[in-house]
Curated annotation (Swiss-Prot):
One of its GO terms (biological process) is regulation of DNA-templated transcription. Transmembrane segments: none annotated. One of its GO terms (cellular component) is cytosol. Its main location: cytoplasm. Belongs to the TACO1 family. This is Probable transcriptional regulatory protein ECA2494. It comes from Pectobacterium atrosepticum (strain SCRI 1043 / ATCC BAA-672) (Erwinia carotovora subsp. atroseptica).
Length: 247
């Protein structure tokens, strides 16, 4: 299947993301602690923890750091009572946006999230307003250069739902989120090194961004990601290579 890969769509944001690495690590550690506290320290029986571990490794976190975070969660050493909150809304150009948060103060979190939407011309919606457009799936991404048939055969044999190859040669393997870890292990065992692996919310439809709406969407995403309580931002905005070059 042809199209624009996440690889192409996010290249222009890499420098900005690198500058946020410290904040990204803090958020991943928070997710590791929470996942271990709620579901135990065994990633084999805790899909949420397994997803957090793979995200940590994709972001070059050391095993020592992530193991300490898991131990904190299992041991209950962190007494902060964090809860997962999902906010839904509409961004620039009619984009559907889901914001996943971990918070110990709902009032603070919703205020910060609403401010980001308002400042960028969007608006915070009600529960269910856009979530029906997204499906929770595992996504294992490979950089351009791998043989498509090799990846596809290994992925489908391992239980993947779909394999998508993009114009630039990048490949995404989509899995049921519950078996994400098993599929990732099978692909690793086949010698296929992933560029990233995570559980994500995949949109069923895309909203094309133009030169006017794309910068506004990027600003919304940046403002949300700058919020300490925000763990993930999912959206259905599609930015073409031509528009991305202008950002």
């Amino acid at each position: 299947m042809a199209g624009h890969s996440k690889w192409a769509n996010t290249k222009h944001r890499k420098a900005a993301q690198d500058s946020k690495r410290g904040k990204i690590f803090t958020k991943i550690i928070r997710e590791l602690v929470t996942a271990a506290r709620l579901g135990g320290g065994d990633p084999g029986s805790n899909p949420r923890l397994r997803a957090a571990i793979d995200k940590a490794l994709s972001n070059n976190m050391t095993r020592d750091t992530l193991n300490r975070a898991i131990a904190r969660g299992v041991g209950g050493d962190d007494d902060t009572n964090m809860e997962t909150i999902i906010y839904e809304g509409y961004g620039p150009g009619g984009t559907a946006v889901m914001v996943e948060c971990l918070s110990d103060n709902r009032n603070r979190t919703v205020s910060e999230v609403r401010h980001a939407f308002t400042k960028t011309g969007g608006n915070l919606g009600t529960d269910g307003s856009v979530s029906y457009l997204f499906t929770k799936k595992g996504v294992i991404s490979y950089a351009p250069g791998l043989d498509e048939d090799t990846v596809m055969n290994a992925a489908l044999e391992a239980g993947a739902d779909d394999v998508v190859t993009y114009d630039d040669g990048a490949i995404d393997v989509f899995t049921p989120w519950e078996t994400f870890g098993d599929v990732k292990d099978a692909l690793d065992a086949a010698g296929l090194k992933a560029e990233s692996a995570e559980v994500s919310m995949i949109p069923s439809t895309k909203a094309d961004m133009d030169a006017e709406t794309a910068p506004k969407l990027m600003r919304l995403i940046d403002m949300l990601e700058d919020c300490d309580d925000v763990q993930e931002v999912y959206h259905n905005g599609e930015i073409s290579d031509e528009v991305a070059e202008l950002l």
